[in-house]
Amino acid sequence: DPPDPDRFYGMM
């Protein structure tokens, strides 16, 4: 499953 958008973009 793909990572949560909030957590994924939060790491960027």
Curated annotation (Swiss-Prot):
<comment type="function">
    <text>Tachykinins are active peptides which excite neurons, evoke behavioral responses, are potent vasodilators and secretagogues, and contract (directly or indirectly) many smooth muscles.</text>
</comment>
<protein>
    <recommendedName>
        <fullName>Hylambatin</fullName>
    </recommendedName>
</protein>
<dbReference type="GO" id="GO:0006952">
    <property type="term" value="P:defense response"/>
</dbReference>
<keyword id="KW-0027">Amidation</keyword>
<keyword id="KW-0878">Amphibian defense peptide</keyword>
<dbReference type="InterPro" id="IPR013055">
    <property type="entry name" value="Tachy_Neuro_lke_CS"/>
</dbReference>
<keyword id="KW-0964">Secreted</keyword>
<dbReference type="GO" id="GO:0007218">
    <property type="term" value="P:neuropeptide signaling pathway"/>
</dbReference>
<dbReference type="GO" id="GO:0005576">
    <property type="term" value="C:extracellular region"/>
</dbReference>
<keyword id="KW-0527">Neuropeptide</keyword>
<comment type="similarity">
    <text>Belongs to the tachykinin family.</text>
</comment>
<feature type="modified residue" description="Methionine amide">
    <location>
        <position position="12"/>
    </location>
</feature>
